[in-house]
């Protein structure tokens, strides 16, 4: 699912803003995930999943930093996230649908934070970008 030049520009422009708030947006995205889809908490039995917890903050930062790697390597997302793909498929065994759920929560968090910048075109570009990441993270399942 190749991104056009315009879509890449839309992703990187918003990412420049998101990158300054990785911890808070990552935390908010995970909190949205757990509030909207409580079944996803089963993958984090060792975490304190209460609102604002240090563990959620840390994992949210990891998730957004991985997205940052994908942005930096937007023409080779597969290569940038190869190790994460193996980790989630072979060790963590995360149900692939959860990547789509988290992507939706990230979209909501970013849109809520930057409403004037999150135009329909930007939304579509980010949706396609996050779908590409989800595809990479689930390709080892096959």
Curated annotation (Swiss-Prot):
Any one GO molecular function term: oxygen carrier activity
Stored Pfam families: Globin
Keyword field: Heme, Iron, Metal-binding, Oxygen transport, Transport
UniProt domain Globin: residue ranges: 2-142
CDD domains xref list: Hb-alpha-like (cd08927)
Gene Ontology BP terms: cellular oxidant detoxification; erythrocyte maturation; hydrogen peroxide catabolic process; negative regulation of transcription by RNA polymerase II
SUPFAM superfamilies: Globin-like
UniProt cross-references to Gene3D superfamilies, sorted A to Z: Globins
Binding-site residues, heme b: 59, 88
Coiled coil region boundaries: none
A cellular component term, taken from the record's GO annotations: haptoglobin-hemoglobin complex
InterPro entries reported for this sequence: Globin, Globin-like_sf, Globin/Proto, Hemoglobin_a-typ, Hemoglobin_oxygen_transport, Hemoglobin_pi
Stated role: The pi' chain is the counterpart of the alpha chain in the major early embryonic hemoglobin P.
Family: Belongs to the globin family.
PANTHER family: HEMOGLOBIN FAMILY MEMBER (PTHR11442), HEMOGLOBIN SUBUNIT ZETA (PTHR11442:SF41)
Other facts: Only one chromosomal locus was found, suggesting that the pi gene either does not exist or is an allele of the pi' gene.
Name of the featured protein: Hemoglobin subunit pi
